[in-house]
């Protein structure tokens, strides 16, 4: 019998209790106190002493997303779509809310142990005796925790809270009867009002979306005091925190329970309030509430507007970035298809300068002769730009020597007879081209300068030959009386322009110190007739056996400017009586002061005459040309020395000081620079010279 009894006890122990079965059945569904389930968020919150006192207070547990439909300050359009909000909140249904609601099923109190039962009995006894101050702090908090009340504050606050809870529990409906709620405050409730309102409780399946309503299971009437009201920062929804004074109906709330409810749910059913002792104070509280609501709505409007502006700026920025990227892609593609080759003007000019001049003139490009530098010299640039000016006043002479070029000193042209010098220049250039072969493939700039008289025909009316008196028979007979210097010149010193194709300024021949045979007068005359000199604007120097030279004298009258005239202010011509002071090579230069007649007029070395016959018209042209070419050059006393004269012509525009050149120092280095005086061809041929003592050539032929 004992064994079956034990088996029955084990079987009963294995079976679940009926109370547990009921709890499991009830746990399959959850209850919602009203048609809006969001007010359930405040249910089941356990206030413990470890919580922050400020956060645990009823004023700090309001929902920031609460609102009101009936409140004048409530904006219904700002509430949003309730169905969408319900769907989103349904996904959070299985969080802490479900576990908290399990502890409050119906009106059952939580299970208490022996200590809790002893504490409740002790509190009831002390309350009945009026000795509630004997409770300790931890005992006060234990009592409040059992009734889910706030635990913040000191002992006095805790004792006051316990007295109020006991009073409300026993005398709540007596102290706050339904008949005392006489004023309708639907849509206009504020902090401090004592209100009564109803709630509908719906039941739905656990885990179902919150937007889906369940079936109605009951109603509940609540009476409480509004201890806090606020506007949410996100949606400006009005939220109330109500301390329950009494509750009856389906699953009533315990006394002094803090209930969080939205304004629209509070104002959904009829809401009534008790009158205040001072209604003016309520009006002030109501105005302060409306002001906060106005500021909250304005802040929300500004925030929405800023958010819209930011969205538009973001869209515009994206469009601009997209357009810029498209433009960059188009530029890159265009550059890839059509590359741009930038060629500067200098590059084109350099390429043009590198063209071989021989190809332009039909000559072979592989000529063994040396070519001039492709870079333009200052002379070439001047010759290139001179035709652009209507009245050229400077002429450059280029002397070629083994691939080098030099610009002669520019001289001021006398504008009285410019056609004479151009005519002589053209004839001289033509003779040089016929007698000597081209030295360089590149044409000499002297050929370009010969075209100037053709470009300026207005000067041709000045091309008139000056009349000259023919010499007498005695003067013609004196031509046959030549000296050893004339014979030495005619036999051994050919014109440098024919031998080397250049002038004395750029080329000099080696001078032999041995005596030369004396030619006959017939040979001298025949030589001058067969080979007249064809050089112009050039100075030739030849060594004499004795090494003597005669200084030059002025050959023009600066005041009258009579060039080649037969009328002279000085005495008549006397042959072989030219007053000139010889200067020995290597001397200290003490005699050059006597050799100089006119110190103010600078006379460069004159070239030989074009022809030895007085009938030739070019002879007169040559004389006039020398006057125009050398007439206006000035030279100071310190600049001119007859031993340095040819060096001044050689260097052109380069200045020389007293220490640059000395006869003794440079004699071994370049002995060709010292030139003796040349015999006067006119005097040898005609026996008299129109220049007289002013002639720069030597008349002493003995």
UniProtKB/Swiss-Prot annotation:
Pfam families: DUF7699, SAP, zf-CCCH. Residues 1-77, 288-349, 405-532, 546-602, 634-673 are annotated as: Disordered. Residues 430-448 have a biased composition (Low complexity). InterPro entries: DUF7699 (IPR056116), SAP_dom (IPR003034), Znf_CCCH (IPR000571), Znf_CCCH_sf (IPR036855). Residues 132-166 form the SAP domain. A zinc finger (C3H1-type) spans 674-702. Residues 326-349, 405-419, 472-502, 522-532, 546-565, 575-591 have a biased composition (Polar residues). Residues 298-325 have a biased composition (Basic and acidic residues). Residues 18-54 have a biased composition (Acidic residues). The keyword Zinc-finger applies. GO terms for molecular function: DNA binding; zinc ion binding. SMART domains: ZnF_C3H1. Keywords: DNA-binding, Metal-binding, Zinc, Zinc-finger. This is Zinc finger CCCH domain-containing protein 62.
């Amino acid at each position: 019998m004992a064994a079956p009894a034990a088996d029955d006890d084990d079987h009963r122990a294995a079976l679940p209790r009926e109370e547990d079965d009921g709890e499991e059945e009830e746990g399959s569904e959850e209850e919602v106190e009203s048609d809006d389930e969001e007010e359930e968020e405040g249910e089941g919150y356990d206030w413990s002493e470890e919580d922050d006192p400020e956060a645990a207070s009823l004023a700090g547990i309001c929902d920031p997303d609460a609102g009101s439909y009936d409140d004048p300050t409530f904006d219904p359009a700002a509430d949003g779509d309730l169905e969408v909000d319900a769907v989103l909140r349904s996904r959070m249904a299985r969080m802490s809310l479900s576990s908290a609601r399990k502890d409050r099923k119906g009106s059952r109190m939580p299970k208490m142990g022996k200590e809790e039962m002893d504490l409740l009995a002790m509190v009831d006894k002390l309350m009945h005796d009026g000795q509630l101050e004997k409770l300790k702090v931890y005992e006060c908090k234990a009592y409040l925790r059992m009734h889910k009340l706030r635990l913040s504050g000191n002992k006095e606050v805790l004792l006051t809270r316990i007295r109020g809870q006991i009073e409300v529990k026993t005398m709540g409906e007596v102290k706050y009867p339904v008949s005392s709620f006489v004023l309708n405050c639907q849509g206009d409730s504020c902090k401090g009002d004592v209100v009564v309102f109803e709630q509908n409780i719906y039941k739905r399946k656990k885990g179902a979306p919150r937007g889906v309503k369940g079936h109605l299971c009951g109603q509940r009437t609540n009476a409480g005091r509004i201890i806090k009201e606020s506007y949410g920062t996100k949606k400006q929804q009005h939220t109330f925190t109500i301390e329950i004074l009494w509750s009856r109906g389906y699953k009533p709330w315990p006394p002094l329970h803090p209930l969080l409810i939205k304004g629209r749910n509070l104002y959904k059913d009829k809401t009534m309030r008790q009158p205040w002792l001072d209604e003016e104070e309520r009006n002030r509280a109501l105005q302060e509430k409306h002001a906060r609501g106005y500021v909250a709505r304005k802040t929300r409007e500004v925030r929405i507007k800023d958010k819209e502006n930011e969205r538009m700026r973001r869209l515009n920025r994206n469009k601009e970035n997209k357009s810029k990227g498209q433009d960059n892609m188009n530029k890159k593609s265009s550059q890839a298809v059509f590359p741009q080759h930038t060629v500067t003007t200098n590059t084109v000019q350099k390429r043009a300068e590198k063209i071989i001049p021989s190809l332009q003139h039909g000559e072979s490009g592989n000529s063994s002769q040396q070519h001039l530098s492709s870079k333009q010299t200052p002379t070439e640039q001047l010759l290139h730009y001179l035709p652009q000016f209507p009245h050229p006043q400077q002429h450059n002479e280029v002397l070629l020597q083994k691939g080098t070029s030099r610009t002669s000193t520019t001289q001021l042209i006398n504008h009285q007879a410019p056609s004479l010098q151009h005519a002589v220049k053209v004839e001289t250039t033509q003779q040089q081209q016929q007698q000597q072969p081209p030295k360089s493939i590149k044409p000499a700039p002297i050929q370009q300068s010969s075209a100037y008289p053709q470009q300026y025909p207005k000067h041709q009316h000045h091309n008139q030959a000056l009349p000259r008196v023919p010499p007498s028979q005695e003067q013609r007979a004196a031509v046959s009386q030549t000296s050893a210097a004339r014979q030495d010149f005619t036999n051994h010193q050919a014109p440098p322009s024919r031998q080397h194709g250049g002038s004395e300024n750029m080329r000099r021949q080696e001078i032999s110190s041995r005596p030369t045979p004396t030619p006959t007068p017939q040979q001298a005359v025949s030589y001058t007739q067969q080979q007249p000199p064809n050089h112009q604007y050039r100075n030739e120097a030849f060594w004499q056996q004795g090494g003597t030279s005669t200084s030059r004298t002025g050959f023009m009258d600066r005041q009258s400017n009579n060039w080649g005239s037969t009328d002279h202010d000085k005495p008549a011509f006397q042959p072989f009586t030219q007053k000139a002071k010889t200067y020995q090579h290597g001397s200290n230069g003490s005699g050059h002061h006597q050799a100089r007649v006119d110190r103010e007029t600078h006379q460069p070395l004159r070239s030989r005459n074009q022809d030895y016959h007085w009938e030739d018209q070019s002879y007169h042209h040559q004389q006039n040309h020398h006057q125009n070419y050398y007439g206006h050059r000035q030279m100071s006393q310190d600049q001119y020395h007859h031993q340095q004269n040819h060096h001044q012509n050689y260097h052109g525009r380069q200045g020389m000081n007293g220490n640059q050149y000395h006869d003794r120092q440079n004699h071994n280095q370049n002995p060709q620079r010292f030139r003796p005086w040349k015999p006067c061809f006119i005097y040898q041929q005609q026996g008299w010279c129109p220049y007289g003592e002013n002639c720069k050539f030597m008349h002493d032929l003995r």
